[in-house]
Structures are given as C-alpha cells and as structure tokens.
Amino acid sequence: MVNLGSIWQNLLASQAPLQSMTGNATTMAGLATYSLPQLPYAYNALEPYISAQIMELHHSKHHQTYVTNLNNALKVHVAAIASSDIPAQIAQQPAIKFNGGGHINHSLFWKNLAPAETPETNYSKAAPSLAAEIEKTWGSFDEFKKAFSAALLGIQGSGWGWLVKESTAEKGRLRIITTKDQDPVVGGEVPVFGVDMWEHAYYLQYLNGKAAYVENIWKVINWKTAEERFQGSREDAFADLKALL
C-alpha cells in the first residue's frame, strides 16, 4: 500500500474492522463511520465577521460532504482489502486523503473559532503561555499577525494556514505553515490553530476581498483552544476526531 503518512495510516487504522478467519478468507465487519461534529456556537455567533449564511453552508453542506465521501471511500477501501484487490485499495487513497483531510481540518477549525469579544478571543488573557512563545519567536503579536496573514494571502488556489508547534527535534518551537487543498498537518507537529482559505469560507460575504476576510478572522480566533493545543500533545489536538466515530 502507498504510504500516505502517519495521519492517513492512523485514519485507516481507526477504521480497522472486526476480522474473522475462515480458511484463507478474511471477513470484515463492524466498519466504524465518521460523523459531522456539532458546532460549539450558533451559526450566527461569529457575525459580523463570518455570516450565518456562510457558517451554515460551510458546516452543514461542505463539511458534511467531506464526511459522507470519507465514509463511502473507507467502505470501498475495506471491501477492497477483504478481496485482496490492491489496485482498488490504491484507487481509494486519493479520496480518503482529500475527504479525510477535509474532515480533520474543519473539525479543528470550528473549535479554534469563537464569538468576538468573549473571554475565549482575548489573546493575552486566554493564551498567556502561547502569547509568550509567539512574542519570543516573532518579537510581538503584531509581527506574528503580519507574518501569518502574509502566509494566508500567499496561498495560491485553495488551502489552509496553520500555526503549529514542533513536537519532535525542537519541541515547543512555533512555525507558520500552509497546506494545499485539504492536506492536514502531518508528522509530529501539533496544529495550534488553522484558517480555511478555500473560497467557500469567505466568498459569499467578502467576494474577492481575501484581505478583509483575513483581517477579520483574527477577531474570532479562539485563543483558549489555541492555548490548550499549545500546551497539549498532538494526540490531545486530535482527540475530538476519535469522539466523532
């Protein structure tokens, strides 16, 4: 099987079916399925910065489509494993990668947003440890915001921008990265928070005004969640996904 990286191996492993052996045949049953997470706020809670219309379409339509397509692809993939059909297994991997990434990214994204002017969106009070590390790395929050915003606006086509924490060689070090399409954060990095730069995240409200969307997204970043992810492990950051099975 093609190596899709640890996140995809974990995704497939989490779907490991019950197996019963009859001679040389493997029977697979009990396939788990993923479900759409509930938002921790109402669709209109992020207004005026993200409209209720965008939030409802983004969550109930776009994210739901990723979940549906992921479950369908995993079902076909498991059947291909059961029949030892390697070409069919390989054929499903792009769909698993794309839709699995869409489910992972959006599940993280919803949790790192919160209504403006709430305790969760107060940068210095909600995220003291993260704020100290940001200012150590970039010199000030303003310089960090400038660098992160530039990375978001530099994405060509569709993708995501992420603040990540290294959890390997340089444990605790912060970096800004971008991922293309629905590729998630892979390897040993912890996603502290992410921003969706697909057009469906902003176009109905901002049209082609990506810069205005990027400026306003800062008003609804959930720094409490970001602080928890910064202080936690990669497993902690992805724990919510396991609960969606």
Curated annotation (Swiss-Prot):
State one Pfam family annotation: Sod_Fe_C
**Enzyme nomenclature, EC number:** 1.15.1.1
- Output the superkingdom of the source species: Eukaryota
What InterPro entries does UniProt report for this protein, alphabetically?
Answer: Fe/Mn_Superoxide_Dismutase (IPR050265), Mn/Fe_SOD (IPR001189), Mn/Fe_SOD_BS (IPR019833), Mn/Fe_SOD_C (IPR019832), Mn/Fe_SOD_N (IPR019831), Mn/Fe_SOD_N_sf (IPR036324), SOD_C_sf (IPR036314)
Q: What is its main location?
A: mitochondrion
One of the record's GO molecular function terms: superoxide dismutase activity
| Cofactor binding summary note | Binds 1 Mn(2+) ion per subunit.
UniProt protein name: Superoxide dismutase [Mn], mitochondrial
Q: How does it assemble?
A: Homotetramer.
The UniProt keywords, alphabetically, are: Antioxidant, Manganese, Metal-binding, Mitochondrion, Oxidoreductase, Transit peptide
Q: Which PANTHER family match?
A: SUPEROXIDE DISMUTASE, SUPEROXIDE DISMUTASE 2
Presequence extent in this chain: 1-32
Q: Which cofactor does it need?
A: Mn(2+)
Instruction: Describe the reaction catalysed, as an equation.
Output: 2 superoxide + 2 H(+) = H2O2 + O2
What organism does this protein naturally occur in?
Neurospora crassa (strain ATCC 24698 / 74-OR23-1A / CBS 708.71 / DSM 1257 / FGSC 987)
Task: Report if keyword Acetylation is assigned.
Answer: no
Q: Give the matching PROSITE patterns.
A: SOD_MN (PS00088)
Disulfide bond entries: none
Query: GO CC annotations?
Result: mitochondrial matrix; mitochondrion
Q: Where does Mn(2+) bind?
A: 58, 106, 196, 200
Q: Where in the cell is it found?
A: Mitochondrion matrix
Protein's job = Destroys superoxide anion radicals which are normally produced within the cells and which are toxic to biological systems.
Q: Which family does it belong to?
A: Belongs to the iron/manganese superoxide dismutase family.
**Enzyme class, UniProt record, top EC level:** oxidoreductase
